[in-house]
Amino acid sequence: MKKIKLALLALVAGVGISLYSCESNTYEEVAGVVENPTYNANVKSIMQDKCTSCHAESTSSQDPYLETYDQVKDACVNYNLLCRIQGSDCGDVMPTSGKMPAARIKIIENWIAQGYPEN
């Protein structure tokens, strides 16, 4: 009987550890937000990961295109890019696959607030 209790306790502990270790935190959520982002160091990779599959000149007709510094800056100024990413009242949330993690949105917010630094 004691062996069964120990085995059951070990099983419950193993399941608990497994569930706890499977949190869905991304690197950005764990590492924090970049306070002084630049396009080349931070924003470009977010656009490539989350946006260019639909917003690239070579693969889509979805305007605005988000492949270059000038295109992304223009989208922020003229297409409400940040509002769309934040999921505010300016249209459907982008990307369509679901809202970006808050840490990535904050990087874009900081980039815009600092005047769109490229390098």
Predicted feature residues:
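Sec-dependent bacterial lipoprotein signal peptides
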Residues: M1-S21
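Aromatic- and Gly/Pro-enriched helix-to-coil junctions and flexible linker segments
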Residues: I4, C22-N119
